[in-house]
Amino acid sequence: MANDPQFYRYVDLRGEWRWRFIAANGRTMADSGEGYDSLENVNRAIETLKREVPSARLT
């Protein structure tokens, strides 16, 4: 049985917040690529991504 896709937030070894997007099959499809200094900032990055992706062009 598949799980729902999700954003996984975590603190890395340097103490920075990061995110991963996990697909329904459990595989990581994307990650933040950079660390954030607070939970608020990582949440803001996730919300920006969720808002912008529907209008993203395939190039």
Located regions from the model:
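Short N-terminal "domain-start" leader segments
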Residues: M1-R18, I22, M29-S32, E47-R57
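A cross-kingdom feature marking solvent-exposed beta-strand/loop segments within repeated
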Residues: T28-R44
